[in-house]
């Protein structure tokens, strides 16, 4: 009888877990739809900025005539790389499957790779999971940003990237790389590594005899465009990461709900079997008692 009570207690516990994970799945699904729409809209704008800046980068020396202009430094890769700044995004919350693992594994591998080349790598962490992971590993973080990955904010994104750009222009770092797990579709996330600084022309069709004309005067537009390019790439990465996070959490909670359902089914079978055995045992005892009285 005690065995039946124990099984019944387990069924109730797993069933409650099933209801919780199913509710979390529904919440993530609703949040995903909103985040997915925001990511798709932002992606179009980010791609267009990339295309324009890539086109300009081909003829940058024609636009900026002063070789000492700081804007040129943002396009020219240094011959010797001594320091690299790595900005990476993870989730502030858990229960999202392997979403954070891809990013953390990639960052850890990059750390080893650069250290093997005697290149100093500085980490700028966005998201509680990544911050706690590297704190546990006793790896120093240059910057820590909490609550930004779960609530993307344009002004805060600007703050993050402006600090990195300033360090590049001041000679404190030679390259800035952005790593995040991005949204591909409702069931797939895609790890993205973006070499933000210096600006690298994207793989689009371009020629040195470009017909692109800049209005207003080239250098004025270039300054605003570069600023927008850095800011929006940072902001888009946050939005893209959040959509991927909701997608991963929706899948994780769906899997957890299905596993809980399967476990409840197993426990119900075990309960029915134990109950049947208990009834059979009682019947045998009754029959045996009657036989002994004859």
From Swiss-Prot:
It is a peripheral membrane protein. Keywords: ATP synthesis, Cell inner membrane, Cell membrane, CF(1), Hydrogen ion transport, Ion transport, Membrane, Transport. GO terms for molecular function: ATP binding; proton-transporting ATP synthase activity, rotational mechanism. InterPro entries: ATP_synth_F1_ATPase_gsu, ATP_synth_F1_gsu. The keyword Membrane applies. It is found in: Cell inner membrane. Pfam families: ATP-synt. GO terms for biological process: proton motive force-driven plasma membrane ATP synthesis. GO terms for cellular component: plasma membrane; proton-transporting ATP synthase complex. The keyword Flavoprotein does not apply. PANTHER family: ATP SYNTHASE GAMMA CHAIN (PTHR11693), ATP SYNTHASE SUBUNIT GAMMA, MITOCHONDRIAL (PTHR11693:SF22). NCBIfam families: ATPsyn_F1gamma. Belongs to the ATPase gamma chain family. Produces ATP from ADP in the presence of a proton gradient across the membrane. The gamma chain is believed to be important in regulating ATPase activity and the flow of protons through the CF(0) complex. F-type ATPases have 2 components, CF(1) - the catalytic core - and CF(0) - the membrane proton channel. CF(1) has five subunits: alpha(3), beta(3), gamma(1), delta(1), epsilon(1). CF(0) has three main subunits: a, b and c. This is ATP synthase gamma chain. It comes from Campylobacter jejuni subsp. jejuni serotype O:23/36 (strain 81-176).
